[in-house]
Amino acid sequence: MIPIGKKYGVDAVFALTKAEDIWRGIEKCLYGNGNAIHFSKYGELPCIRAKQINRGIPISVTDNKLHFKLGRMVFGIQVNDRFQQDEVDAVLSYLAESDILDDRAVNTLIKDGYCIDTYRPCYATLVPKMIRGKYRVYLHLTIEGKAKPKYDKHGNPRHKYGKGMIGADIGTQTVAYTSDTEVGLKNLSERGNSIQTSERKERLLHRAMDRSRRATNPQNYNDDGTVKKGRKTWKYSNHYKKLKTKHSELCRINAINRQLAINEDANYLRSLGDVFITEPKNAGKLMRRAKETTVNSKGKFNRKKRFGKSIKNRCPSGFQAAVEEKFKTTGGTYIEVPNDYRASQYDHTADDYIKKKLSDRMYHLADGTLVQRDWYSSFLLYCYDYRTRNIDRDRCISEFEKCYSKEEALIKSCLLYTSPSPRD
């Protein structure tokens, strides 16, 4: 047997960490909901992680600063803002008296039954990234405990935490919410007006790559344009490689903008209330292709594609996970209603469930009131009854007029914003 250090040139702690990651994926296939194990693609940059802070990438303190060592290289941390400085100070304070803080955490857990934040450094990870055509390596330090609160330059808290209930209907592209103070309907993962332009550029580059790949490898395609089955050899031109570099850079920028937009929306919702009520995540089901073959009124076959592109561009599950983490870590409450709640079908004026078409975005209630479908679902989630875990019809009747007036103003502002301006 050849030692792993001689064969691959890595230490045992790195091999053990990577083996645990692989076994976690195998466990999902054996005992969970996983179907197949996916290998890393050629050219992907691997993350280098050591599961022990004193081995592989050990941490040390010199001149009251954190330093890390990998082989013969010694490097520190570049602190850019006050939040990072607070995190570094918390780690330094733990390393100065680690035994005392560990004993205090254990005693608190035994006596009071909860964990305190020790800010113990757990492990370090080297994350390589390709940014603007150059390789950059970042160090991610995983710390035990909750993140430090953020403050602005004047010393005030950067984020405010509100009180009250929030009902939110998270769709594939939009989120509608109803709170004690306001109602809203906005697109997911959107910062400004640049996301639609970026998505269009991404599509154009992807099509240009496909044309170049087809022109360079005509032997791998059938006469009807489909890819041949079996083992194939692909050749890529220099033009294709340049397009791929542009496409990768654009995808990286779009992913960062999506994550920033998700964090901004989660922080804003947390400022409206401390109880968040929504439906369970179902993006994975909506992303799958339809199994049944159907025909439309013109006799043509309907496409089996569903919401895969919308989910990829808008990340509804990522937004819901970020909101859940935000509310739970800041002292709030996150509630997912049961599957039989059916907020999209209930009509509180008729006290009955009425099924609607997916294309009916605006519809009339039983008493003739015109409502927006997504907002009305969020309103029914807002009227959640803790005892029965169902819709509280009495609260729907008492709160509807106040919330409906806000919804009318919201729809008018949306129509005014989207209407074209007259030409001179």
Regions found by a protein language model. Give the residues of each.
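A short, hydrophobic C-terminal helix/tail in secreted or cell-surface proteins
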Residues: P420-D424
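Residues forming well-ordered secondary-structure scaffolds
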Residues: T17, D21, R132-K134, Y161-G162, ...
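Acidic carboxylate diad motif detector
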Residues: M1-I131, K309, N313
